[in-house]
């Protein structure tokens, strides 16, 4: 079982077969950030700390994401797979064994529950 949430789903799109270089999620159903839910600003806010472990008066804001994840995932799954954005729904979690994807961090609890069901009960499909 391979699970990824939020922008980490990108790793699945870029993991490739050595021979034909197709994505390992080709033909699979996945979810991730839809264009409607991409951050417009505020990606990468981080409190920075000095060598004395005290907060510094600075942080990092990279603005919007560096890439539109929806388009990357749509291309990676190909014509026989499907991207499910879950727009308008609080949660968007897809299990297409061996891949379990959650659109964002609010999917974490459900992703964890589905991990248990997949590993202990043999669940192979959920969310579409």
Feature-to-residue mapping (PLM):
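Active-site-adjacent pocket-lining segments in enzyme domains
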Residues: 1-3, 7-128
């Amino acid at each position: 079982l391979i699970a990824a949430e939020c922008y980490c789903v990108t790793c699945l799109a870029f993991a490739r077969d050595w021979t034909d270089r197709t994505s390992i999620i080709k033909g699979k159903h996945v979810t991730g950030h839809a264009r409607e839910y991409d951050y417009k600003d505020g990606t990468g806010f981080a409190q920075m700390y000095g060598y004395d472990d005290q907060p510094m008066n600075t942080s990092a804001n990279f603005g919007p994401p560096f890439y539109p994840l929806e388009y990357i995932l749509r291309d990676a799954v190909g014509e026989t797979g499907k991207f499910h954005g879950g727009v308008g729904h609080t949660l968007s979690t897809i299990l297409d064994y061996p891949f379990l994807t959650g659109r964002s961090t609010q999917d974490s609890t459900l992703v964890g529950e589905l991990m248990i069901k997949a590993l202990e009960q043999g669940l192979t499909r959920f969310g579409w």
